[in-house]
Design a protein with these regions (language model features):
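E1/E1-like adenylate-forming module used to activate ubiquitin-like modifiers
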Residues: 100, 108-185, 189-195, 212-216
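S-adenosyl-L-methionine
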Residues: 88-103
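A short helix->loop->beta-strand "cap" motif at the edges of active sites that frequently abuts
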Residues: 48, 91, 135-137
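Glycine-rich phosphate-binding loop and adjoining beta1-alpha1-beta2 segment
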Residues: 47-88
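N-terminal charged helix/coil linker that caps or initiates catalytic domains
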Residues: 1-27, 143
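Glycine-rich adenosine-cofactor-binding loop
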Residues: 19-46, 51-57, 187
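Short amphipathic alpha-helical segments
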Residues: 39-41, 64-65, 127-130
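Core catalytic loop region at the nicotinamide-binding pocket of NAD(P)H-dependent oxidoreductases
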Residues: 196-208
Length: 217
């Protein structure tokens, strides 16, 4: 039987992608351009719970790439995002407004069924990688660079990049299109893992993407 069109997850139920019954806890580390949009996408696809880790606060410049509102400026990102997700879909997100470091990573990530690293610096990414390997947790790394390149890679194949000479990704002029493309790929990858344990790795380069028009008849 098809799902009722009254359901807020009608499309996901038809596609076999509904996550409402999923009892696995996804932990998203970093609630910036990638993490905040990925959390919103997963919540709108039906994920009923997640953990959000970020110590930063919403700034005016975040509004162009992140799902926050003007009224959220000055608020802690993790808490503002948790409220947004609950209002939108009743997703219950545990907000942890702490900076993840090598000293507290084990404690913050423990109890997760999947860790998604959406951080923007190598030191924190390394702390996540060290912790998930110690705790034997599956981990997906998602990120992009200032030259229009992005990747969605499982930890087994991931090498933490040296960001000492890398430009701020948000300085890339097409940050929002690339970010949304990358979030879509990451969301599909997370869902495939949650539903059947599949692990796929991807690289995304916006300049190589081909969108071809259909021929007129």
């Amino acid at each position: 039987m098809l799902a009722s069109t009254a359901s807020p997850f009608f499309h996901e139920q038809r596609a076999g992608r509904n996550l409402r019954g999923c009892d696995l806890k996804v932990c998203i580390v970093g609630c910036g351009a990638i993490g905040a949009n990925l959390a919103e996408t997963l919540a709108r696809m039906g994920l009923p719970q997640m953990r959000l880790i970020d110590f930063d606060r919403v700034e005016p410049r975040n509004l162009s790439t992140q799902p926050f509102l003007r009224s959220d400026i000055g608020q802690l990102k993790a808490r503002a995002l948790a409220r947004l997700l609950y209002r939108a879909t009743q997703c219950r997100a545990e907000a942890i407004a702490e900076k993840l470091t090598s000293e507290n990573a084990d404690k913050l990530l423990a109890g997760s069924d999947l860790v998604v690293d959406c951080l923007d610096n190598s030191a924190s990414r390394l702390a996540v990688q060290t912790a998930v390997r110690k705790l034997s947790l599956p981990c997906l790394h998602v990120g992009f660079s200032g030259d229009g390149y992005g990747e969605v890679i499982w930890d087994e194949r991931y090498a933490v990049p040296d960001d000492s000479h890398i430009a701020d990704p948000c300085d890339y002029p097409f940050t929002r299109p690339l970010m949304h493309l990358l979030v879509g790929v990451a969301a599909e990858t997370v869902v495939r893992f949650l539903l059947n344990g599949e692990r796929l790795n991807w690289t995304v380069t916006l300049s190589d993407l081909k969108i071809l028009p259909l021929p007129f008849r």
